[in-house]
């Protein structure tokens, strides 16, 4: 899904550039009501932060349970999704997730 927000996938693009820019504009900051960490949000999307590392400052997406994550980076033109067979027990900072994201950006 995230790949189709930054470009076409099999001829389909989910949102226009203008809609994407509108959706990822930071609309709120401060402690998240559930996670209690400072996380900037656009319209339904987490933005890159110290707590929710999504690759770069042009990334938008969302973390899920146990270290799963999905995001897009419109400047790097990538979509990324990761789910695992064994969930991490922490609320943030799964080293497997961080290592995969780092490897993607190192390969660009």
Residue spans of the language-model regions?
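Catalytic loop of the DD-peptidase/beta-lactamase superfamily, centered on the K-T-G motif
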Residues: 2-108
């Amino acid at each position: 899904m995230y790949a189709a927000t930054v470009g076409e996938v099999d001829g389909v693009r989910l949102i226009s550039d203008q809609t994407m820019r509108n959706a990822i504009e930071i609309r709120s900051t401060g402690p998240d009501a559930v996670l209690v960490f400072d996380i900037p949000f656009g319209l339904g999307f987490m933005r890159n932060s110290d707590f929710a590392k999504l690759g770069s400052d042009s990334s938008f997406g969302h973390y899920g349970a146990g270290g799963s994550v999905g995001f897009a980076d419109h400047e790097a033109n990538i979509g990324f999704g990761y789910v695992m067979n064994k969930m991490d027990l922490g609320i943030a900072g799964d080293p497997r997730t961080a290592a995969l994201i780092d490897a993607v950006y190192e390969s660009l």
